[in-house]
Every structure is written in C-alpha cells, then in structure tokens.
Design a protein with these regions (language model features):
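N-terminal small-domain helix-loop-helix segment of the aminotransferase-like
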Residues: 2-92, 99, 279, 386-388
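PLP-dependent aminotransferase-like
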Residues: 102-165
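Conserved glycine-rich beta-strand-loop-beta hairpin in the small C-terminal domain of fold type I
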Residues: 274, 290-300, 312-325, 357
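Helix C-cap/helix->beta junction micro-motif
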Residues: 128, 190-191, 343, 386
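Active-site phosphate-binding strand-loop segment of PLP-dependent enzymes
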Residues: 138-209
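PLP-dependent enzyme catalytic core of the Aspartate aminotransferase-like
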Residues: 331, 338-347, 353-388
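Conserved core segment of the aminotransferase class I/II
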Residues: 46-47, 221-293, 301, 383
Length: 388
C-alpha cells in the first residue's frame, strides 16, 4: 500500500490541524498548516513503538551517538560536514529563535525578516520587545527575489542587529541559492548582523534545487536551525538542533539557553532522530518529496487548464505552495467567504503572513491525491459559478 495515500484520522488526539478542521463547515477540505495528512516514516514509527514499551522516559542528553546521527544526516541529506560539538540542542526552532533574540539583541533593536513572512517569526520578535523590520521581497509573476538595495539599507542601520532568514522560504517555497547566501553573508559580515537561518524544510527541496546550510557562508555570525519537524512531520514533539560554528557565538547562546532553563531533550525525539536520520529515513523523505511534487504539478495543471485566473509560485523547496488569487479581484473578506463557504477550503490566508501576502493563500501539499482532486473540483465549481 502507498502510505502517502493514507489519510490519518486526527479526531480524539488533540491535534491542532484536526481541531481547526472540526470548526469548519462539513465537507471542508483542510490544506491548513504544514503537517502531513499521512503517517511519518515506518522506521521512526517502529523505533518509537519499541522505545515506548521499555517504559523509560527520563532525562535525556545529546550523547555521542546522537551527535553522530546528526553529523551523518547532514553529510547524507545536505552534503555538508559538521563537527559533533557544533550541534546545540533546543526545544524547537521557535524556542531556539527566542533564546537567540535574547542572547544577541536588546529590547528596542530591529530584527530584519523577509516578507511575506512566517507569522511566528514576527510574533517572536515582537514578544521579546524587539522591532520587526520588514525586508519585503520583490514579486513578479509569482517569482520572488530579494530587494538587495532595501536589505543593505536595513543592515547598515545600527539599530538593526539581527536577521531571521527562512530557507526554503515559508510561505513562498523559494530556495535561496548559494550566490544569494554568499551575498547575504557578506552584507551581514560587513554590518555586524547575526543571522538565524531556519532550515527545517531543507530536506524537502525539489530536484534541481539544493539548500546549502547558511553557516557554510557565514560561519562567524550564522546559526542554522535543523529539525525532524518538517521532513518527518514531527512538529508535535518539541525539538531542534542549532548548528553554531563560532565558539563565541556558541558560548553566548548556551549562556542564554541556561537562563531559559533548557533542561533535557524529549527521549522520544532522541529515539526518533536516531531512527530517522538513516539511509532508510532519507529514502522515505525522497519518496515523500516525489509525492508532493506530483501534487504540486496536479494543482498547477488544473489551474492552467481549468482556472486560468489562479496560479502558483514555483515550488523550489518545502511542501507548502503559494496560490495567487489576486486576479479574482476580491477583498480580503470576500475572498475568505468565497474559499470557506463556497469552495469549502480551510487553508492559511495570505494576510496571515503580513501585508505582502494580501491576495495569496498558502496550501499544504502533503495530502492524498484524492483529497486534492476533491479540492480542485470544488474550487472549479465555485470558480465557474461566479462566472470567472
């Protein structure tokens, strides 16, 4: 059986995606969030089941076996060698970002982030009393690029001391390629900016695209965040690994992590990582990537042939895609009503990602083909009923 066509029942488990679906109209298609509809890799499920039966769930450390698993994965899946002691564990990417903001910035200082932006980045910045400094990307026919002049102007402002980069970019699915990363790193080095790069979607880059670790280009000022979360749909077990090469940067980060009371990692995460960061796990991720690429192509073909006023940004990395609905000429409220009541779709509105997301919608590609076909048929019927 193709497990990528198996739809998981989320009822009764407190699942966030399931809870959102429960509030929607009956028959609603849920392409909300960035969590897979199908089960995670068999190697992880088996390892967790075996571990659960041991009944041993105590404090857990990042020992040598754990670190070697991360090093092996970075070499196999990312073609990048890291040193075991450059791995810093934390309780999640956003937890790690919050710690970094407190370690390296002061209240009132500016933090640069590319917009449209994953909303929790902006929340983390604001919640720590720092200022969100938007570096709005340029968009042309759904293709996004950095506004380099604006980025340098903001990096050169002494009030701005930190940048959050997301690669692959969420929500646009853009991959920042090596020439772009080199240029970002050169500017950050010139102006003394610390860069926190969220790379938790890195392993989902599609063919022809590669996510190089930011620390390859900015080892003195860069922090790379990695995780099982997206590649294996493991976001509910809080965890992340930060890769920090510079010793002073690492020392300062660890001091703040201690203040934030890190404690120990979740033993289930330890077990899942060692099982997933293997050749079997990597083969599963590559098969999952092929499935999401087919879903994307299925959507793109339907829009081009059946609903030409709608279009998708290119999918370079991640399993979310960015749908452009601007040609429908609907206000935010009208668009929400059209999608939720007429199309019966639950997904992330573009406005969730800031003003630069207006007129767009983020869709999750890690669904079954049957679910996507149902969504496309419902969308086409509502689209044509409106006379588009």
């Amino acid at each position: 059986m193709n497990e990528f066509e198996l739809y998981l029942d989320r009822n009764g488990f407190g699942n966030m995606k399931g809870a959102a679906a429960a509030k929607a109209l009956p028959g609603t298609t849920v392409l909300y969030g960035a969590e897979m509809d199908f089960p995670t890799a068999p190697c992880i499920r088996k390892a967790l089941a075996d571990f659960a039966m041991k009944g041993m769930y105590g404090y857990t450390l990042a020992d040598d076996d754990y670190r070697q698993s991360v090093c092996g994965w970075m070499k196999m899946a990312r073609n990048f060698e890291i040193q075991p002691m450059d791995i810093v564990t934390t309780l999640g990417t956003l937890f790690g970002l919050n710690t970094a903001l407190r370690a390296f910035t002061k209240e009132g200082e500016g933090v640069i982030v590319q917009h449209p932006s994953y909303f929790n980045f902006d929340k983390a910045i604001a919640n720590n009393g720092r200022k969100v400094v938007a570096n709005s990307m340029k968009e042309e026919n759904g293709v996004y690029s950095l506004d380099w002049e604006d980025l340098e102007a903001k990096m050169s402002d002494p009030n701005n001391t930190f940048m959050v980069l997301c690669n692959p970019h969420n929500p646009t699915a853009k991959v920042f390629h090596p020439d772009e990363l080199k240029r970002i790193a050169a500017l950050a080095e010139q102006y003394g900016i610390i860069v926190f790069c969220d790379e938790i979607f890195a392993e989902t880059a599609v063919k022809g695209h590669e996510v190089r670790p930011y620390i390859e280009f900015g080892p003195k000022h860069g922090i790379t965040a990695t995780s099982l979360g997206k590649a294996f749909s493991f976001t509910g077990v809080n965890h992340a690994n930060l890769l920090i090469v510079d010793e002073d940067l690492k020392k300062r980060y660890l001091a703040q992590r201690k203040k934030d009371h890190f404690g120990s990692m979740d033993p289930f995460f330890y077990t899942a990582l060692r099982a997933g960061y293997t050749e079997e796990g990597w083969n599963w991720v590559q098969a999952m990537n092929q499935h999401t690429q087919e879903i994307y192509e299925m959507m793109a073909k339907a829009f081009a042939e059946r609903m030409p006023l709608l279009s998708l940004s290119p999918l370079e990395g991640s399993y979310v895609c960015w749908l452009d609905l601007r040609k429908l000429n609907l206000s935010c409220e009208e668009r929400q009503s059209f999608l939720s009541e007429e199309v019966k779709l639950l997904a992330n509105q573009g406005e969730d990602f800031g003003p630069d997301g207006e007129g767009f919608m983020r869709l999750n590609l890690t669904a079954t083909k049957a679910v996507i076909e149902n969504f496309l048929n419902n969308l086409e019927a509502a689209y044509k009923k409106r006379g588009y």
